[in-house]
Amino acid sequence: MLRAGAPTGDLPRAGEVHTGTTIMAVEFDGGVVMGSDSRVSAGEAVVNRVFDKLSPLHERIYCALSGSAADAQAVADMAAYQLELHGIELEEPPLVLAAANVVRNISYKYREDLSAHLMVAGWDQREGGQVYGTLGGMLTRQPFAIGGSGSTFIYGYVDAAYKPGMSPEECRRFTTDAIALAMSRDGSSGGVIYLVTITAAGVDHRVILGNELPKFYDE
């Protein structure tokens, strides 16, 4: 599973694959940074150590997955298909808000059947970098957002460490430190850290390997 911090629907079925997860997104002037851990589990077993939970919805719009791996990826695939058609009809890239609304509508429509939470972030010409939460059918724009089972361990840290007006590199460091802290505390989060930086210039992908993760006092 990508086990969400606040799952929806029924309890996980035995053997269901989940991403017991830590996901995060941060706005900066001119773009966004998204990050996630990479551990996927089925029950007590880790079935994938390097799963990329940052899924593209469009050229400069991504979502971060948590909850049931199958459910979350299905929502992302449906949203990406609708946004592709939307872009063709408009003859221009879709807005990040439109993408977040598509994800929100799918999640709410199938809320009784799905165990998934997707965080949407990206860049468009109208609003620049944006981060949206879609949990439970709500749609909220935030300067930064965290989610997944690991997020419960880092609320205090992110509230204290976040500063408005951070540079892209500061946002990447903030995201890396927060996810690494969650991975050190949450048994369902682990592996490597995937980072995506989205700006008008394009998308920059980075991977922070296990031996490159920040070290903390308790380690």
From Swiss-Prot:
Task of the protein: The proteasome is a multicatalytic proteinase complex which is characterized by its ability to cleave peptides with Arg, Phe, Tyr, Leu, and Glu adjacent to the leaving group at neutral or slightly basic pH. The proteasome has an ATP-dependent proteolytic activity. This subunit is involved in antigen processing to generate class I binding peptides. Replacement of PSMB6 by PSMB9 increases the capacity of the immunoproteasome to cleave model peptides after hydrophobic and basic residues.
Keyword list, A-Z: Acetylation, Cytoplasm, Disease variant, Host-virus interaction, Hydrolase, Immunity, Nucleus, Protease, Proteasome, Threonine protease, Zymogen
Tell me what turns on expression of this protein.
Answer: Up-regulated by interferon gamma (at protein level). Up-regulated by IRF1. Up-regulated by tumor necrosis factor-alpha (at protein level). Up-regulated by tetrodotoxin (TTX) in glial cells. Up-regulated in Crohn's bowel disease (CD). Up-regulated by heat shock treatment. Up-regulated by CD40L via the NFKB1 pathway in cancer cells.
Provide the disease association from the record. Proteasome-associated autoinflammatory syndrome 3: An autoinflammatory disorder characterized by onset in early infancy and recurrent fever, nodular dermatitis, myositis, panniculitis-induced lipodystrophy, lymphadenopathy, and immune dysregulation. Variable accompanying features may include joint contractures, hepatosplenomegaly, anemia, thrombocytopenia, recurrent infections, autoantibodies, and hypergammaglobulinemia. Some patients may have intracranial calcifications. PRAAS3 inheritance is autosomal recessive or digenic.
Q: What is its main location?
A: cytoplasm
Where in this protein does the record say N6-acetyllysine is found?
53, 109
Taxonomic source organism = Homo sapiens (Human)
Residue ranges of the propeptide: 1-20
Name the domain of life.
Answer: Eukaryota
- According to its UniProt record, how is this protein modified after translation? Autocleaved. The resulting N-terminal Thr residue of the mature subunit is responsible for the nucleophile proteolytic activity.
This protein's name: Proteasome subunit beta type-9
- Which Gene Ontology MF annotations are present? endopeptidase activity; threonine-type endopeptidase activity
Q: Which catalytic reaction applies to this protein?
A: Cleavage of peptide bonds with very broad specificity
Q: What Enzyme Commission number(s) does the record list for this chain?
A: 3.4.25.1
| Effect annotated for changing residue 165 to D | In PRAAS3; digenic inheritance; patient also carries a mutation in PSMB4; patients' cells show reduction of proteasome content and cysteine-type endopeptidase activity of the proteasome
